[in-house]
Structures are given as C-alpha cells and as structure tokens.
Amino acid sequence: MSWLNDTLVGFDLETTGTVPAESRIVTAALVEAKGGEVVRERGWLANPGVPIPAEAAAIHGVSTERAVAEGRPVAEVADEVAAALCTHWRDGVPVVVFNAPFDLSLLDAELARHGLASLAERLGGAAPGPVLDPLVIDRAVDKYRKGSRTLQSACGIYGVELAGAHRAGNDALAALRVAIALGRAYPAQVGELDPTALHARQVDWDRDWAADLQSWLRRSKDPAAVVDGGWPAR
C-alpha cells in the first residue's frame, strides 16, 4: 500500500536565524495528517533565551517581547518536540520536513546545548527516519528546472495552498501536502516506494546533488568550495 494515503507527520521550526549550530527555536509544529487531511496538530512557542533578531521576527511574526512573555523555556520545548518526533519514528510514521538538514540539525544542536539526549540517542543509536524531504525529492525528480526551490515555490508548482507562510503549523502542513503531490506526480520514483526505501533514496539524491553543486562551484567560482551533502541531518 502506498504511503500517500497513510498517516504522515509534518514538522517545521521557526527560529532566530539561519545557521543550525547557532540559531535557536522560536516556534515548532507537528501536524499529523492522513491522506493530507489534518488529524492532529501540536504547536510550541519557546523563549529562546536570546534576543530574536528583527529580521527573523519580521519573517515568522514572533518578537523577543512576545517570546519572553508567552514562550516556554526552550529546553522544555526542544525536549518535547524531540520526544514526539521519536515516538512517531518508533511507530513507523514518516515525518515530512522541507529541508530536513536545517530543522533536524538545529533541533539536535538545541538538545546538545541544554544537555539533553540527541534524536539518535533517543532512538537507540539509530538515525532519525523515515524522513520525507520535498526539497530533496523535487531537486531529484525535476533536476533541471530553473528558479527558486523554496517551500512557497514548490507549493505553486505542485498545486498546494500555503496560507500564512513561515508559521510553523502552516509550513508543516504545506510540506506534507507537497510530499503527497510529488508522490502522485512521480509514482515510480516516489509514490510507490516504501517510506524506508524512499528515505534511503533521498540520502543518495542529496549526496549526488551536493557533489554536482560542489563541482560547479569549483569550476565557476571557488576552487576550494565544499558542499556538505549530509542528509537528513548534518
């Protein structure tokens, strides 16, 4: 049976910045859906313990003042989010994350910062998964398409509504629906694969993409360029 009509969980973080090792969680969401229809949604607002830069607040709408007044300690949020993710993985439920290395690496960095067990440690040493990453899948199945590869652009291409971009719950659900749309558009490459097999294929796809990008950068811009292709976390 295809995973397209089964339970999936969309995951998204909104953060203080764009560097996973340094940025902090501001909001998080897990959206459970079956066949693309929402069954349950969980959301968190964290006090990241550092000021939220104005440019980040302008994107996701959470100011430092609001995070301090309404947010929970970021360590508690990170721990709860990690526990929930690992429960889904233990149950065999695929987690959909657009640009998974950002969100999963940032979550692991946040856990380490507060002396909490990593995702792998919570899974008995196993890597997180299965993960479905619409960004990695889209780059592989439509390799030569020009233009942006953001979640917003993917929604436009695959006919998914995204109301209120950069709100964690909205982005998580949109990513989940883009994954389903990709599976339907590319059944042999995506939709008909078992989620575990698709996870493994994405590891290869991301590695190949990184190698191609690194080669292009070295030829055209920087002979010493290095592109890290670790997926789903770096």
Residue map of PLM features:
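DEDD superfamily 3′-5′ metal-dependent exonuclease/proofreading module
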Residues: M1-V26, E32-R40, A69-R234
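Short glycine/proline- and acidic residue-enriched helix-loop micro-motifs
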Residues: V62-V68
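Short, surface-exposed acidic-centric catalytic microdomains
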Residues: R40-H60
